[in-house]
Amino acid sequence: FLGAASQRTKKIRLGPLVYVLPLWNPIRVAEEVALLDNLTQGRLECGFGAGVGPFTFAAYGVPWDEKRKMAWEALRMIKGIWDNPSYSYEGEYFKCKNVELGIPLVQKPHPPLWMPTRSRESLEEAASIGVSTIQWVPPRMKVIRAAFDQYRDAYQRAQPAGRKPHIGLMREIYVAASDKQARDEAKDHWIYFWQRRGGARAYGGYGHENLTTMLDGERKKELLDIDHSITDGSFISGSPETVTRQIQEIASKAGADTFLGEFAFGALEHHQVMNSLRLFTDQVMPELRKFEIDALNYPKAEPQVAAT
C-alpha cells in the first residue's frame, strides 16, 4: 500500500503503524523501510511494535510471552544495519552476518520512528533512544497521561542525541457540518467498531490489560455510549469548530504534540469518509497549526487526592 501511495502523493508523510517486529525478519524490515524511504523521497515515518494480541502470534508459532524482548532485539538489529556499512549481530532471537544495506536511506540517520507502548520498561527504552510514542483510545485519559509523564521523565534523564521525538494521540474521528449530523451519521459505526474490535481474537491483549476483559465491564459501557465517548475525548466527532476544540482539549490533557486521526472505521461509506477528511483538511488543520504544545517539557500531572 505505501509503495502505491508514495507514487500518487507528493507532500503527505506516510508510514506503517506498526511493523510487529517479533513476526518479521529484521533484515527484511531494514531493507523494506529503506526502499520506502526512497520511494517517498524522504516522506516516511515508521512505526514499530511488539504486538497486541496472542492469536496472531500463535498462527506464526512465535512465543507471545517473549514479544517485548524480541521486539527490542529486532529494533537494535535494524538500527545496526542502517548505521553500519557491514553489520553482524548475534542475539537471543535474531542473528545476521556481514549484512550490507544496498539501498541508502534518504533521511539520516533513519526515518522518524514511532512505538505505541504503555509498559514502563518499553516507555523508558523508547524515550532513551528518541523513539516517539503514541497512545490509542482504550485506556482512560488519566492512564494515558501517566504513561506520557513516564516517557517525558525518561527522555529528560537520557537526553538522547538526534531529532526530538513526538508524543501522539490517536483517535477515531468524524467531521460533519454540525455536531448533530456528525453524531447521527457516526453513531452506528462507532458502536459497531467497538463491538467488533473489542471481541476480536487479534485484539485479545493491549499492553498489560486484556482488551476483551476490559471492554466487558465499565469501560465497555463507556465506549459504547457515543455521547460519553465524545464528552470524554475518546471519540472526536462534530462540526469543524467542535472537532478543533476537542483535539486541543485532549492534547492539553495528555501533553501531546501530535494527533493521528482514524477516519475510516465501522462501516462508513467512502463518500462519508472523504467528506470528513475534506472538512478536517480545509477547516480544522489550519486552526490546529496555530496550536502548539511543548510535549517533551510538559508539566507533570498533579497527583489526585482522594476525598475523605
Descriptions of predicted regions:
Residues 1-14, 108-111, 298-308:
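N-terminal beta1-alpha1-beta2 module of alpha/beta enzyme domains
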Residues 1-16, 70, 74, 280-292:
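Alpha-helix-loop-beta-strand connector modules within alpha/beta enzyme cores
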Residues 2-11, 33-44, 124-128, 156-162, ...:
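Acidic (Asp/Glu)-rich catalytic clusters
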Residues 5, 36, 78, 113, ...:
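Conserved, mostly hydrophobic/aromatic
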Residues 14-16, 44-48, 113-116, 133-136, ...:
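Hydrophobic faces of well-ordered beta-strands that scaffold small-molecule active sites
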Residues 22-89, 93, 133-134, 139-143, ...:
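Flexible, glycine-rich active-site loops centered on histidine and acidic residues
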Residues 65-101, 142-256, 285, 289-308:
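An alpha-helical appendage that flanks or caps ligand/catalytic pockets
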Residues 119, 123, 127-139:
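A conserved active-site cap/scaffold subdomain adjacent to cofactor or substrate pockets
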